[in-house]
A protein has these predicted regions:
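Gram-negative bacterial Sec-dependent N-terminal signal peptides
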Residues: 1-33
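Predominantly soluble domains enriched in secretory-pathway, periplasmic, or organellar proteins
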Residues: 26-382
Length: 382
């Protein structure tokens, strides 16, 4: 296979504290293939040359996750700047200019620490209903906002812990209209929220090792009527039927060293029949992307990336895989063709690369958080 294309990285780089300097990194990268292989060469061979640079643009405090609306060509970002939730919002961003068009005024709630914002962490787009779903992780709730008005239309905030619809520590959410559910990761369970009734059904996975607390990973994937769930504690990928909620299969993730793998995100390339799984590992060991046969789940290869590989997405048209490294703040680029190798690492803004998404035109939008640096901001009280 030969590849001739031009790619663009667009990164939203931002501070992790309430008054930290924020920015957006636009990273143009070109991947140019060699001419068609000679007759003596394999038709699957390709050589990719890459060039990359970063351009920084203003972002949001504490960005955690990013989502994309194909219908409106808008980028959505959820962010909470500090653990005390003094700053939290969701933003709608023009995908072409990366300019912030609007931000939501999140509700202020009362808890044992006083009055704080309803903290936004995970986010996904529902273009069928014209909404965005947000996980309020540290507040143990889910909220839905109108894409146009940014007004909250539904939330689980305020329900009792004894309520069967209560979800503990919701982290990632994904809407699937084929099954009529919104799937939410959290502590102990994956929850399926009925899109019409908003009733919750808990999906039980295999128990965590040694009876410990299970931490479902940040991202999940729905593909072909199956829900793919990375489970960080036990290092497994669970494959769940989206209609019956039955676990059809599971497989262990692999790294390049002894110890925990801690899978975090997952993508499938049907043209290569491969599953890609990012893993954070521990202290730099097992950080990278592992590759599996999409049919048999047989382990094929591990590609080391950075020191804490986190989010992952793939460009199936060009067989490219992108992975954010929270440890180094870089975005790794993997040739997902026959070579299955790391071909580039693109630096962002010196922060911690958190999440990313591939757009239909092949651009990549990545968000990061600054590493705790603060700034003095002049202001006047009215």
């Amino acid at each position: 296979m030969n590849l001739a294309s031009s790619k663009v990285f667009k990164g939203l780089a931002v501070g992790s504290l309430a008054l930290a300097i924020s920015g957006v990194a636009t990273i143009p990268a070109s991947f140019a293939a060699d001419p068609a292989p000679a007759a003596s060469q394999s038709s699957d061979a390709r050589t990719i040359a890459d060039k990359a640079m970063a351009k920084i643009t203003q972002g949001l405090p504490g960005q955690f996750q990013v989502a994309y609306s194909k219908k409106t060509n808008k980028i959505w970002v959820a962010g909470t700047a500090d653990r005390d939730k003094h700053v939290s919002t969701i933003a709608r961003i023009d995908a072409n200019s990366l300019k912030i068009e609007a931000v939501a005024e999140l509700p202020i709630i009362k808890n044992d620490k006083g009055y704080q914002y309803d903290a936004a962490y995970g986010i996904t787009v529902d273009d069928v209903d014209g909404t965005v779903w947000v996980t309020n992780t540290t507040d143990n709730s889910i909220s839905v906002y109108d894409q146009e008005t940014l007004q909250q239309t539904w939330t689980t905030a305020g329900i009792a812990e004894t309520d069967p619809n209560w979800i503990e520590h919701p982290r990632s959410v994904l809407v699937d209209h084929e099954s009529g559910k919104a799937f939410v990761t959290g502590r102990f369970f994956v929850s399926a929220i009925d899109l019409k009734t908003k009733q919750v059904e808990k999906i039980q996975l295999e128990g965590a090792p040694d009876g410990g607390t299970r931490y479902i990973s940040m991202n999940i994937l729905v593909d072909g009527g199956k829900l793919y769930v990375p489970e960080r504690t036990g290092g497994k990928i669970f494959v769940v039927d989206t209609k019956t909620f039955k676990v059809e299969s599971s497989f262990d993730t692999k790294g390049n060293a002894e110890g925990e793998v801690r899978p975090s995100d997952i993508a499938i390339d049907h043209s290569q029949n491969e599953i890609y799984v990012s893993s954070q590992g521990v202290k730099g060991a097992n950080s990278g992307v592992s590759i599996y046969d999409a049919t048999t789940h047989e382990f094929k290869k591990f590609i080391p990336v950075g020191t804490q590989a986190l989010a992952l997405d793939n460009d199936e048209d060009n067989d490219l895989v992108y992975v954010s490294d929270f440890g180094t703040g870089k975005v790794g680029v993997i040739d997902g063709g026959a070579a299955d190798k790391l071909i580039a690492e693109v630096a962002m803004n010196g922060g911690k690369a958190n999440d990313l998404v591939v757009l239909p035109n092949g651009s990549v939008v990545a968000v990061d958080k600054q590493a705790g640096a603060t700034a003095t901001v002049p202001y006047v009280l009215d």
